[in-house]
């Protein structure tokens, strides 16, 4: 089985998918997520302690896990004891984590600090907020029936310690590094971190040590949907069978990764990027004229076919997708 643009596909027998089933599953997950988020009330005081006390024990354990903290028996541990143990660790963690932030994340943190910690205009459906919540940076709660996200006072204080011109430059570099890395896996599919580090460093002007690079990459793997981090490699989300791709790479022995110019990599690092070749434009025009698809539908169809071909499948699978 494989998944292309939300469509489950049988790649070994009949090439089929059920978009309706996929959409139903996504809707169920959305409802469960919102139900879980809306169980919390906005604390009167936006302190870190009150934010943590508002969480369930399971949610506190999730933060422990994400921060690689010691974990005891959940049923035998008092919630107050969990909060007392987690609170200083969250403060220590965010002080280190902020250095890997991207511009989009910085914009959120700046807004929070400018509005006493409150974030009123975030897209509630953005699952990436759950990542920031899972590492203790942001929290949420209901106020008069409205869902609000917020940054606790202690987290704001840690952020303000480093939020200066030098930090803004570092965030720009982080954003550039992740954009280039995402562009590379768009073309390569998958690449190990050592080689990725060397290739990214060849493209940038600033200095970057490997530890900082890995912090950027792992932050990016949780923030950018088009990339996936593994233990040893970064890969593009369109790769269906990374093991087969790595085997093919090893079989080619001394054949190196192709070099691409900076602009090409930077463009390819965009979310939902599609390289607009002549073949792409011709096929998209065909879908619009012959199948009455709109521009976005045609682009999605061409991108899906491109993913099928990139993953080693052929005309049989393409015809199955088009049925």
Annotate the PLM regions.
Residues 2-150:
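Basic helix-extension-helix modules of the SAP/HeH family
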Residues 55, 103, 115-120, 186-194, ...:
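Short capping segments at the starts of secondary-structure elements
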Residues 74-91, 139-167, 227-247:
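Accessory beta->alpha helical hairpin/"wing" motif in late/C-terminal subdomains of nucleic-acid enzymes
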Residues 80-104, 162-178, 273-280:
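Short alpha-helical segments that sit at the start of domains
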Residues 94-97, 153-188, 240-267:
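Short, amphipathic alpha-helical interaction segments positioned at domain boundaries
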Residues 127-139, 203-232, 314-323:
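Charge-enriched amphipathic alpha-helical scaffolds
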Residues 180-219:
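Non-catalytic interaction/regulatory modules that flank or connect domains
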Residues 227-320:
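Long, charge-rich, low-complexity intrinsically disordered regions
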């Amino acid at each position: 089985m494989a998944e292309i643009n939300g469509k489950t596909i049988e790649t070994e027998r009949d090439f089929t998918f059920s978009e309706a089933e996929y959409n139903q599953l996504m809707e169920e997950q959305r409802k469960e997520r919102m139900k879980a988020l809306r169980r919390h009330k906005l604390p009167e005081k936006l302190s870190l302690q009150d934010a943590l006390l508002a969480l369930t024990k399971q949610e506190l354990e999730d933060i422990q896990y994400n921060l690689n903290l010691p974990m005891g028996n959940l049923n035998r541990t008092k919630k107050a004891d969990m909060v007392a143990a987690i609170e200083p660790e969250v403060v220590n963690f965010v002080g280190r984590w902020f250095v890997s932030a991207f511009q989009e994340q910085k914009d959120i943190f700046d807004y929070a600090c400018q509005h006493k910690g409150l974030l009123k205009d975030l897209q509630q459906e953005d699952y990436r907020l759950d990542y920031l919540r899972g590492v203790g940076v942001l929290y949420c709660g209901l106020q008069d029936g409205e869902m609000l996200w917020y940054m606790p006072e202690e987290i704001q204080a840690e952020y303000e310690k480093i939020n200066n011109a030098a930090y803004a430059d570092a965030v720009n570099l982080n954003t550039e590094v992740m954009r280039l890395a995402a562009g590379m896996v768009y073309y390569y599919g998958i690449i190990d971190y050592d080689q990725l580090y060397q290739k990214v460093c060849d493209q940038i002007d600033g200095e970057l040590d490997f530890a900082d690079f890995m912090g950027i990459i792992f932050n990016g793997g949780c923030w950018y949907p088009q990339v996936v981090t593994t233990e040893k490699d970064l890969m593009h989300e369109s790769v269906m069978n990374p093991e087969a791709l790595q085997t093919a790479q090893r079989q080619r022995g001394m054949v190196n990764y192709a070099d691409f110019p900076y602009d090409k990599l930077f463009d390819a690092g965009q979310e939902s990027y599609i390289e607009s070749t002549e073949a792409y434009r011709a096929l998209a025009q065909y879908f619009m004229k012959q199948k009455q698809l709109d521009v976005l539908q045609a682009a999605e169809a061409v991108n899906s076919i491109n993913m099928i071909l990139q993953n080693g499948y052929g005309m049989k699978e393409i015809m199955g997708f088009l049925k």
